[in-house]
Amino acid sequence: MSLGLLCCGAFSLLWAGPVNAGVTQTPKFRVLKTGQSMTLLCAQDMNHEYMYWYRQDPGMGLRLIHYSVGEGTTAKGEVPDGYNVSRLKKQNFLLGLESAAPSQTSVYFCASSY
């Protein structure tokens, strides 16, 4: 694998219970070349106001990228550079990478809360 590849894994949050996940991420896994763009979808079916996008790099804890406090609102987190977000519907929070860079190789997580 060359350094020119960017691997972005989007993993669903763990949940307790059977079929209904509550929060889901799409796609679950993605590999990009440097400079490519992509969008991750975080969807929740619990009518939550707050939604969050995090990244976790090797050897580090979760770091907040962006968050939303309701439909149509977004705010920057700890590491917002290189990302854009939108929340046009209460149940969906999109995270976009316009031009992927090797520094964005990470595991991405989304979450929601009241």
From Swiss-Prot:
Residues 22-114 form the Ig-like domain. The keyword 4Fe-4S does not apply. One of its GO terms (biological process) is adaptive immune response. Glycans are attached at N84. Gene3D superfamilies: Immunoglobulins (2.60.40.10). InterPro entries: Ig-like_dom, Ig-like_dom_sf, Ig-like_fold, Ig_V-set, TCR_beta_variable. GO terms for cellular component: plasma membrane; T cell receptor complex. Residues 1-21 form the signal peptide. It comes from the Eukaryota. It is found in: Cell membrane. Pfam families: V-set (PF07686). Keywords: Adaptive immunity, Cell membrane, Disulfide bond, Glycoprotein, Immunity, Immunoglobulin domain, Membrane, Receptor, Signal, T cell receptor. Disulfide bonds join C42-C110. SUPFAM superfamilies: Immunoglobulin. The keyword Disulfide bond applies. V region of the variable domain of T cell receptor (TR) beta chain that participates in the antigen recognition. Alpha-beta T cell receptors are antigen specific receptors which are essential to the immune response and are present on the cell surface of T lymphocytes. Recognize peptide-major histocompatibility (MH) (pMH) complexes that are displayed by antigen presenting cells (APC), a prerequisite for efficient T cell adaptive immunity against pathogens. PANTHER family: T CELL RECEPTOR BETA VARIABLE 6-2-RELATED (PTHR23268:SF19), T-CELL RECEPTOR BETA CHAIN (PTHR23268). Alpha-beta TR is a heterodimer composed of an alpha and beta chain; disulfide-linked. The alpha-beta TR is associated with the transmembrane signaling CD3 coreceptor proteins to form the TR-CD3 (TcR or TCR). The assembly of alpha-beta TR heterodimers with CD3 occurs in the endoplasmic reticulum where a single alpha-beta TR heterodimer associates with one CD3D-CD3E heterodimer, one CD3G-CD3E heterodimer and one CD247 homodimer forming a stable octameric structure. CD3D-CD3E and CD3G-CD3E heterodimers preferentially associate with TR alpha and TR beta chains, respectively. This is T cell receptor beta variable 6-2. It comes from Homo sapiens (Human).
